Amino acid sequence: MTTIARAAAVSPDALRETFSHFPQAVALIGAEVDGTPLGLVASTVTAGVSLDPPLISVAVQTTSSTWPLLRAAPALGGSLLGAHQSLLVRQLASKDRASRFSGIDPVITTDGALTIPGSPAHLWTRLYNEVEAGDHTVALLEILDTNSLEGADVRADDPPNTDALVFHRREFKGLPAP
């Protein structure tokens, strides 16, 4: 048996390094608010939190200036971003909110949920609940509808690559489909 002494407190840098070993799905949570497309990129989305009601969770930094606007929207779209969208994710995550959707033609539902075309999977949701969790807010989103680029859902103009984009070891990487 080996006995070790643990540090009194874990540093944020040590946590980031440890967490970087966990591949995380990358998604855009979006809505049109007052005629303006808004969205935030999250790598803290947890699918399958609950099947009844159907819920996902997303952790949002409490310093986000976009979340207060999104949380008030009647509906939110979720786009699971694909490996072919790795360059797009940097634009969507830009601190410059006005340029995030420059050159992008998002799909917006009548209730304002915003999704990115060509993403491997989409969710249409609404805010179910929020929980304060340290420097983040964990938002539970109730899933109202879904689709994915598989089988009958594939459209002629969709990209052939539906591999998921993940954030792993502080880089965006494609996660190949089986």
Predicted segments, located by residue:
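Basic, polyanion-binding surface patches
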Residues: 2-178
